Amino acid sequence: MHTLPHDGLALASLEEHLLQPGTKGLPILEPLRQGAIGVQGWNVLNADTSFPVALLKMSSLRHNLDWMRRFCERHGVTLAPHGKTTMSPQLFAAQLGNGAWGITLATVPQVQVAQRGVRRVLLANQLVAPADIKAVLALLKRDPHFECIVLSDSLAGVVRLAEAVAAAGLASPLPVLVELGLSGKRAGCRTLDAALTVARAIAGAPGLLLAGFEGYEGLLVTDDRTADLRAVDAFPGAAGGAGRHCR
């Protein structure tokens, strides 16, 4: 996989984006370069911007970035923080610059925003809609250094991805994670056998690459903290167990 998770030149292009009058919160009467916001001298305490307004304190941001980097190093884990809350390529760059492996996102439009510099995205959702598949493959074909790891939990989904990749003529295989799910919940393979069936289909499909297994432990949480901790601690073992069956 590509070793550079971020492209500073693509991020710099955002500085040239023109903000138009009517942009929420900004007191501008003429178009303004986004990169010029910092020299306008605006002060929220003087009500120069409309409310509500969110402020980021750089010292706190640097502290949080450093703390999370050291936490991951101490525990020997890699992190792809979820970007759907901030939707800020500048913050994505700061996270990647502090050791993040990539950025997690939930929708294809979010992936399109992240491509302003982000080189590696985990799309933590089923990629099944034809328009979404077409958009992701177009991004990959346009930029050979861009990586997008997607999910699948069904044979039908694998077939759809494989057919689309073949039609697109990608130079590299599309990495796919098998999603592990929970009975009665929103997505994912319900059993180990189902997960292994999907995994074998991915591994045997031209144009696809079996990248591993993943799941969302948040759906395990109840109001019983002790039981929740046990369940969440055990959940990664399911993914590891599925992976060992594939060796």
Task: List each language-model region with its residue ranges.
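Structural preference for beta-strand elements that scaffold enzyme active sites
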Residues: T78-A80, G102, R120-L122, E147-I149, ...
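Generic structural signal for well-ordered alpha-helices
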Residues: M58, R62-R69, F92, V111, ...
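A charged N-terminal "starter" segment
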Residues: M1-A138
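Active-site beta-loop-alpha junctions enriched in small/polar residues
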Residues: T86-S88, V108, Q126-V128, L151-G157, ...
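Internal, well-ordered alpha/beta segment that forms a basic, Gly-enriched binding/recognition surface
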Residues: V150-S172, V176, S183-G184, A194
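Active-site loop/helix belt of alpha/beta enzymes
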Residues: G181-R247
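Acidic (Asp/Glu)-rich catalytic clusters
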Residues: D66-G76, Q95-G97, Q115-G117, V136-H145, ...
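Glycine- and other small-residue-rich loops at beta-strand/loop junctions that grip anionic moieties
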Residues: A80-P81, I103, N125, V150-D153, ...
